[in-house]
A protein has these predicted regions:
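Conserved beta-strands of PAS-like sensory domains
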Residues: 128-132, 169-203, 244-257
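Juxtamembrane extracytoplasmic/periplasmic/luminal helical "stalk" adjacent to the first N-terminal
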Residues: 6-15, 19-89, 207
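Soluble periplasmic/extracytoplasmic beta-strand elements of cell-envelope proteins
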Residues: 116-119, 175
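Extracytoplasmic/periplasmic sensor domains and loops in membrane signaling proteins
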Residues: 86-104, 111-114, 125-165, 191-239
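Beta-strand residues that line the small-molecule/cofactor-binding core
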Residues: 5, 169-171, 229
Length: 258
């Protein structure tokens, strides 16, 4: 009887011990699963936040380029210079007018990095451009903007068009506005370097953000220390024609989930 009692007692202890061990293991597994699920949700959320912030950044850029474009596009002196392009003096004066924002500034000049101002006729042929700014552009409107303008309906010809596009592997941002008011005589293009505005993405998300070229070159580095406790979350910012333009990498503080 004593031996049987001991055996039953030992078996009971063993069973409860096994149950306890199994419960601990299941608890650990469940905790790990929910942490991973929470982390996955945070990553997806941050990726979406970065995407929205990128679009908000471009909208703010567009606001400044549109304002500058509309100011120049309604300038009577500039319009008259375009109409008199056969005259050498008028052509030189037109270039001076296009250079003026680079020399004397404009409202919002500290918010964008102006690269070039160009003028096209109604057939989208380049007829003049600022002498100031980059000299590495092709002498034509980007394919994307050309297609958008060419496919517009007649009642849309007075609308401005924006585009993030790639020029010789370098992303640029343009706003194209009609030149001449209600009776356009051409188009005016404001071209800026969007790299200048990429740090604004981190300001919007309120998280550390680094930006890279598509080839992996670091463009902008956040000042926060992200060496410990941060998980990178990547988002690719595409040009208007869906070509990859920038790699935006945000960093999620995973210590908050522990």
């Amino acid at each position: 009887m004593r031996i049987e009692a001991l055996s039953i007692k030992s078996a009971t202890i063993a069973i409860f011990t096994m149950i306890g061990v199994i419960a601990i293991i299941l608890s650990l597994l469940a905790g790990s699963y929910f942490r991973q699920a929470a982390l996955g949700a945070q990553i997806d959320s941050l990726s979406r936040v970065i995407e929205v912030a990128s679009q908000e950044m471009l909208k703010e850029v567009s606001r400044h380029t549109f304002d500058l474009g509309m100011k120049l596009g309604h300038s009577e002196e500039l319009i008259q210079a375009v109409k008199s392009l056969d005259n050498t003096a008028a052509h030189n004066r037109l270039v001076e007018l296009l250079d003026d924002p680079f020399v004397n500034g404009f409202v919002g000049f500290s918010k964008i990095d102006l690269e070039k101002i160009r003028i096209y006729n109604l057939e989208l042929e380049l007829i003049s451009q600022s002498s100031a700014g980059t000299t590495e552009l092709d002498g034509q409107l980007s394919d994307y903007l050309t297609e958008q303008v060419s496919n517009r309906k007649h009642n849309e010809r007075l609308k401005a068009i924006d585009a993030l596009w790639i020029s010789s592997d370098v992303p640029l941002y343009s706003t194209l506005v009609p030149l001449g008011g209600l009776r356009p005589i051409g188009y005016l293009e404001i071209i800026i370097n969007p790299v200048f505005n990429l740090p604004d993405i981190g300001k919007i998300t309120k998280t550390p953000v680094n930006t890279f070229s598509i080839t992996g070159e670091l463009i902008n580095q956040d000042e926060h220390d992200i060496s410990h406790g941060y998980l990178p979350v990547e988002f690719t910012l595409h040009a208007s024609d869906d070509e990859p333009a920038f790699r935006i990498v945000g960093y999620e503080n995973v210590d908050k989930l522990n």
